[in-house]
Regions:
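Conserved catalytic or regulatory cores that recognize and/or transform ribose-phosphate-containing ligands
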Residues: 1-59, 64-310
């Protein structure tokens, strides 16, 4: 596999303030659960190395999310070598029934004893020589291949109030004068990148503003284009739009903000701070990335922009 951008959240983002880091506080993300769920929502696949109580909690949190569990893979150490089953009977019963779509890969780690106290010794694991063996590597690569998908983005009117949980489907319904829309995190990230291809939006982002003003601007543009696109399909006017994220109950602006953070950490855009003001610029990598994608937003010479179906 060719080398890709690797993003370690702790190397880019922090709670509170620290020089050289973007702060979660500035985009109103206050807890680690929301951050991890949003990161998982943006991802094609999720791999959890399950060897402790904390990873068990993470496994349960993701596996109980209908939108996330279908793209999960759990790496579990061989129970014989560590003399215990890391996936408990409760987790097994709750999430690993015969029709479960969660993939499991057993690996054979190096095991050592860690003395917590005189009477309590715990078995802990390492990858042998801190490397992934060819056999395990092939299994992981097979899962990655499975997760590669072309986002088939399409708009679908809800029937009987039921949301379509397919990643690429944007579900919508009209409730009085309000348009209610449900979008996956992956589609939002993809469409935000599309917005950054629009000259007028890029010009506004290059101006020095407070960070929340940039976020509100991108969020407003996103909602306006989405609103117009669906109104054209409904052939009906609605006054307001409410956009919800399928995977997690957070505000749309929080998702837009975190998508900008992720693009910055992946070196696709720059978020530059000068005193208390910020300006956002595009990097060459984003232009190259967008050139390899199908059109996301209608041409700029159209009077009103629309999001396009794939």
């Amino acid at each position: 596999y060719p080398k890709k951008n690797v993003l370690i959240l702790e190397e880019h983002f922090v709670f509170g303030k620290r020089e050289g880091y973007l702060s979660y506080d500035d985009i109103f993300l206050k807890n680690l659960n929301d951050i991890e769920t949003l990161s998982a929502a943006f991802a094609n696949g999720i791999i959890i190395i399950h060897d402790s109580i904390s990873t068990g909690a993470e496994l349960a949190a993701f596996a109980s999310n209908e939108m996330l569990k279908d793209k999960m893979c759990v790496l579990e150490p061989d129970s014989t070598g560590i003399e215990e089953r890391k996936i408990s009977a409760f987790l097994e019963l709750a999430f690993f029934s015969t029709d479960s779509k969660i993939r499991r890969i057993v690996y054979y780690p190096e095991v050592y004893s860690f003395e917590i106290s005189e009477k309590h010794v715990e078995k802990r694991t390492n990858f042998v020589n801190n490397t992934i063996t060819p056999i395990l590597g092939d299994k992981i690569c097979s899962f990655i291949d499975y997760c590669k998908l072309e986002l088939d983005i399409r708009f679908e009117k809800m029937k009987f109030g039921k949301i379509n949980n397919s990643v690429g489907v944007i579900s919508y319904s009209k409730n009085g004068n309000e348009l209610q829309v449900y979008v996956s995190g992956q589609v939002i990230l993809y469409q935000v990148m599309g917005l950054l291809s629009i000259n007028d939006i890029r010009k506004q982002l290059r101006k020095k503003k407070r960070l929340y003003e940039h976020i509100d601007f991108v969020c407003g543009q996103y909602k306006n284009i989405l609103h117009h696109t669906i109104q054209e399909k409904l052939k009906s006017e609605t006054n307001t739009i409410l956009v919800s994220v399928k995977e997690i109950n957070v505000e749309l602006r929080d998702v837009i903000a975190y998508s900008l953070y992720m693009l910055q950490a992946l070196e696709l855009i720059s978020i530059l701070k000068e005193k208390e003001l910020y300006k956002i610029g595009l990097k060459n990598n984003l232009g190259i990335f967008l050139s390899e994608l199908d059109d996301i937003v209608s041409e700029e010479d159209n009077e009103i922009l629309e999001f396009l179906n794939e």
